[in-house]
Amino acid sequence: MHRPDVQIIVNTTPCGMFPNVGQCLIDPKAFPALEAVLDVVYNPFRTELLLRAEDCDVTAAGGFEMLVAQAVFATEHFTGRQLDTAAIIPAVSRELRHQLANVSIIGMPGCGKSTVGAALAKRLDKKFVDLDAEIERRTGHNIPDIFAQEGEAAFRRYETDVLAEIAKGNSQVIACGGGVIKSPANTRALRQNGPVLWVRRPLEALATGGRPLSKGGAALKQLEAERTPLYEAASTVVLENYGTLTAAVDKAVQLFEADERL
């Protein structure tokens, strides 16, 4: 399909809605004049259709605020009260999105993802999920053993499968492994329900002991050079983790609360 006459797309089907996330009926690239996409699906926040629209630099909006508006207008109807809908709907939508949003943390091995993530989850009253620990729990093997016995490709398959399930959830801080961004499917899974926070830390300050792909020295510099463009492409916000844990968490909270995408 190639339709140069279409400027706006509105999806009113349940395609892409939880639990069947990732489904999409059309490709925005087939519509060269496209200016905006509205998907009335509200879970996840960003369906595959919206993610594809964003990839095309097209204005995209989901159905979450519409869901809130429906509740507000229903309240008016059944109670007979007149509400300040222009103020209430966006305010309630933003508050609920902050409550439900995931914060996914990416970055180089040893940059502090798990440490910052656990503390951030406590501050935001969200569940903390360490993706590597969850992979170990589900496979029954620790990650160095998976790399040694099955290879990196097998580990990456486990990683993608586990993340696909976890990322469907809400109200989580997800600390990911350093190489999670190597798969576009992983990046899309992380983006569907909240911001992706890239934790950056000086190379010499990285804690790399016991990590399969982090040997230090020249190898670590090469790994950073390879992955930095992927972190840049996957992230929506950047946290410079150059100081104390408290400072990093304070800044992460500020970035989350100020995120205009929520």
Give the label of every model feature segment.
Residues 113:
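Conserved lysine of the Walker
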